[in-house]
Structure formats: structure tokens, C-alpha cells
Curated annotation (Swiss-Prot):
Entry's family note: Belongs to the ArgJ family.
Pathway(s) served: Amino-acid biosynthesis; L-arginine biosynthesis; L-ornithine and N-acetyl-L-glutamate from L-glutamate and N(2)-acetyl-L-ornithine (cyclic): step 1/1; Amino-acid biosynthesis; L-arginine biosynthesis; N(2)-acetyl-L-ornithine from L-glutamate: step 1/4
Subcellular location: Mitochondrion matrix
PTM section of the record: The alpha and beta chains are autoproteolytically processed from a single precursor protein within the mitochondrion.
UniProt site positions, description: Involved in the stabilization of negative charge on the oxyanion by the formation of the oxyanion hole: 132-133
Lineage, opening ranks: Eukaryota, Fungi, Dikarya, Ascomycota, Saccharomycotina
Enzyme class, UniProt record, top EC level: transferase
One Pfam family matching this protein: ArgJ
Enzyme Commission (EC) number: 2.3.1.35, 2.3.1.1
Designated name of the protein: Arginine biosynthesis bifunctional protein ArgJ, mitochondrial
Miscellaneous comment as given in the Swiss-Prot or TrEMBL entry: This protein may be expected to contain an N-terminal transit peptide but none has been predicted.
Length: 428
């Protein structure tokens, strides 16, 4: 094992101990699992399934990449045809994206759907399908179709089952991303559970990442779709690892109502409460994706304040998060605020250059380090700046000085030598 792989091995152990839960609070009425069926060359888990014991409302947000993968096309059509109703299961393979695979790829995705539905005795087209991995290669579909009944026989609802499911959708991830929580609405307890994968090709408007979260709350398809769009715009569309956009991104939500209670629609008094709960939950899950960015050593929150609109604040934050110059400076622990300001300046947003402020906000709770105040550079304590940049977590706060009072958060990571190594070796 060379030094780089050894370092990554120990980094993986460290991240797992920090971010992989030992227990969870999972929603009622779902069972999950994963097996190795032979998509990946090694023996790691590569086929994951999620099953709702009763048909559920469902919604999804898909990639904006023009080369949409076969499973994206198939799942989108299923949701459209069923108006988000009667979805019972999700099947995911990792190790092969089934993208840019022509009509054969569409047929393979449909076979995966049909095999799950027939095995579970579902109504036709009750399953959503996802794939992640190498682009441009056909799936080993026979292995997958043989594996699906095996995986479905081994589903369960324990924490270990959920963890295996999260492991089953990993590619270059160093740890499984699993989050769960319980919350109350009008005195009734509901739960959420979510899984995600994605360590590279992450940028706004959905990039190589798969995610699904499920709840036992009784949410209508229309309300769930609106909630998911809102939550995704403030979570998975506010993260960036390398600025590449994938062919496969899918974020899906299901609500089976197993916990009971009055159905929640867009006009219900409980709508805003559950929207807020799901949005915060989605942000937590999305941040785990950034923390596992390929080769990442830093988790960076970019907080843009005093913009004319939320859209402007998000544009500026995104501009900084996707700047390779900024990200490499963070890896090099270089407090080069000029790269931040440059990215602010070329974003298509209103900025008052005479009132713009830039600061580092240390993760250890110590005082902020002001870099720019009202458009004028501060005398920076380089030693203090270096101390701040030694920390794993960092917040960069920018005030645009427009008087609009709107703000947005964006989450990103640094760009390291290891990122090049990982992606150079991806197919080997």
C-alpha cells in the first residue's frame, strides 16, 4: 500500500468514526437491504433495495445534464405516468451508471423495475430505479436480475439493514451516508431516514449523487413534490465538490403514511412545518456528501449575506464554491481572499463594491478574522489566518452590502492532489 492509499485508509477510518451513526430512528413501514451481485469487480455491496410495506407518495428531482442516464429516464416516466402515487420500492445498482447506453440501457432499467415488481407482486411500474458508476458501459444485467430476488428476501428494518443499504450505493465514497431523525407535528411523532452517495462530480443542479429519503408521514404527492423541490434547492443544489455535472443524479422522496394522522397537502396547516423539517434534514444529508468529497481535507460553508434576493446570494456563493483557484488555495491553507473577491465579482448578481465585507469564521468559536471591510482590505494577521486554515471546518462570510437583507448558504470542500489520483485511477 503506497503512502497516498495508506493516508486515505486512515482518513476513511476517521470519517467513519465521526459521521457514520451507531443507531437511528427509522420511519415505520419500510424495509431495506443490499447484496453483492457482481456489478463491481470486487466483492463490495453493489445492489440496494428499499421497500415500502404500503404504496407511497413519491417525488424526485433529476439531473439537468442533457445526456440523462437510462434509469433517470425510466424513473421520471414512471412518476409522470402515476402522478407520484403508488410507488412501493426503489432499486439501485452501484459500479455502473447505465448512462449513454442506448435503447439497450433503457431495456435494462425497465427489466430491473419489472423484476422488483414481479418479485414483490407489486402493481406494474411501482418501482423507481437508479444507477451510479462508470458511464458508457452496459450493465451486467443478468447478474442484477438474479440478484434482485436475493436482495429482496434479505430486507429488514434494523439499523444494520439501513447501513448496508447505504453501503450498497457507494462508489468512490469513503463512508456510507445515512441520517435519520424523529419529529412531531401536532403531537404526533413522525420519522425520516435518508441515504446518499456521491464523492465527486458534485455541483449545483444535481451532480453525481444519488439520494433518497423516506418518511412515515402522510404527505400527498403534490405536497411532497413541492417540498422536495424547495428542500433540494437549499441542500443538494447548494453543494459542490468539483463542479462536474453527472448524467445520473436523482434525489427521491417517499411518504407512506404508516405513522397515521391527517393527510398533509399543500394547503394544510402542517405543510410549512414538515417542509422545514425535510429541508433541514436534506441539508444535513447533503453536507455529508461534501465531507466525503474526493480527496477533500476541508469542509467549507460559504455564507453570503445582504443580497438583493436569495437567488443573487446563491449565485455568489456558488461562484466561490466552484472556483478552482479558491478551492486549491484552501487546500494549500493560503488566506488568499483576492480569489474569493474575484469569484464574487464575476457572479451575475448585484454587489455594492464599496460596502462588501469578507471574513473567515473559525470553527472553534473564536473571533472572526476580517479580510475586507466596506471594500477596503484589512491588515491580516497571517499567523492567525494559518491557524484558522488548519481547522477541518471553515465558514467564509461575505456581505454584498446591497441593503437587500437576503442570504444563502453553500457547502463545498478543497481540491487536493488526491482528487487527481482518485479520478485518474477510477476505471482501474
Amino acid at each position: 500500500m503506497n503512502n497516498l492509499k495508506l493516508a486515505r485508509f486512515f482518513a476513511t477510518i476517521s470519517k467513519e468514526s465521526k459521521y457514520v451513526p451507531n443507531s437511528g430512528s427509522y420511519p415505520l413501514g419500510y424495509k431495506v437491504g443490499a447484496i453483492h451481485c457482481g456489478v463491481k469487480k470486487n466483492s463490495t455491496l453493489d445492489l440496494a433495495v428499499l421497500v415500502s410495506e404500503t404504496p407511497a407518495s413519491a417525488a424526485a428531482v433529476f439531473t439537468t445534464n442533457k445526456f440523462k442516464a437510462a434509469p433517470v429516464q425510466v424513473s421520471r416516466q414512471i412518476l409522470n405516468d402515476k402522478n407520484g402515487k403508488g410507488i412501493s420500492s426503489i432499486v439501485v445498482n452501484s459500479g455502473n451508471a447505465n448512462a449513454v447506453t442506448g435503447k439497450g440501457g433503457i431495456e435494462d432499467a425497465l427489466k430491473m423495475v419489472d423484476t422488483v415488481d414481479s418479485t414483490l407482486k407489486n402493481a406494474p411500474s411501482s418501482t423507481l430505479v437508479m444507477s451510479t458508476g462508470v458511464i458508457g458501459q452496459r450493465l451486467p444485467i443478468d447478474n442484477i436480475l438474479k440478484g434482485i430476488p436475493v436482495a429482496l428476501k434479505d430486507v429488514g428494518s434494523s439499523h444494520e439493514d439501513w447501513l448496508r443499504c447505504a453501503q450498497g450505493i457507494m462508489t468512490t465514497d469513503t463512508f456510507p451516508k445515512l441520517v435519520s431523525k424523529s419529529f412531531e407535528i401536532d403531537g404526533r411523532k413522525y420519522s425520516l431516514a435518508g441515504l446518499a452517495k456521491g464523492a465527486g462530480m458534485i455541483c449545483p443542479n444535481m451532480a453525481t449523487l444519488l439520494g433518497f429519503f423516506v418518511t412515515d408521514a402522510p404527505v400527498t404527492p403534490g405536497a411532497l413534490s413541492k417540498i422536495l423541490t424547495y428542500a433540494t434547492d437549499r441542500s443538494f443544489n447548494c453543494i459542490s465538490v468539483d463542479g462536474d455535472m453527472s448524467t445520473n443524479d436523482t434525489i427521491c422522496a417517499m411518504a407512506n403514511g404508516a405513522a397515521g394522522g391527517e393527510e398533509i397537502s399543500e394547503t394544510s396547516s402542517q405543510f410549512s412545518k414538515i417542509q422545514d423539517e425535510i429541508t433541514l434534514f436534506a441539508q444535513q444529508l447533503a453536507q455529508l456528501v461534501v465531507r466525503d468529497g474526493e480527496g477533500a481535507t476541508k469542509f467549507i460553508t460559504i455564507n453570503v449575506q445582504d443580497a438583493q434576493s436569495y437567488a443573487d446570494a446563491k449565485k455568489v456563493a456558488s461562484s466561490i464554491a466552484n472556483s478552482a483557484l479558491f478551492k486549491t488555495a484552501m487546500y494549500g491553507k493560503d488566506a488568499n481572499w483576492g480569489r474569493i473577491l474575484c469569484a464574487v465579482g464575476y457572479a451575475d448578481a448585484d454587489v455594492n463594491v464599496l460596502k462588501t465585507n469578507v471574513s473567515f469564521i473559525p470553527a472553534d468559536g473564536s473571533a472572526e478574522l476580517k479580510l475586507l471591510v466596506n471594500g477596503e482590505p484589512e491588515k491580516v494577521d497571517e499567523e492567525r489566518a494559518s491557524e484558522i486554515l488548519e481547522l477541518e471546518d471553515l465558514e467564509i462570510r461575505i456581505s454584498l452590502g446591497t441593503g437587500g437583507g437576503q442570504e444563502a448558504n453553500f457547502w463545498t470542500c478543497d481540491l487536493s492532489h488526491e482528487y487527481v489520483t482518485i479520478n485518474g485511477d477510477y476505471r482501474s
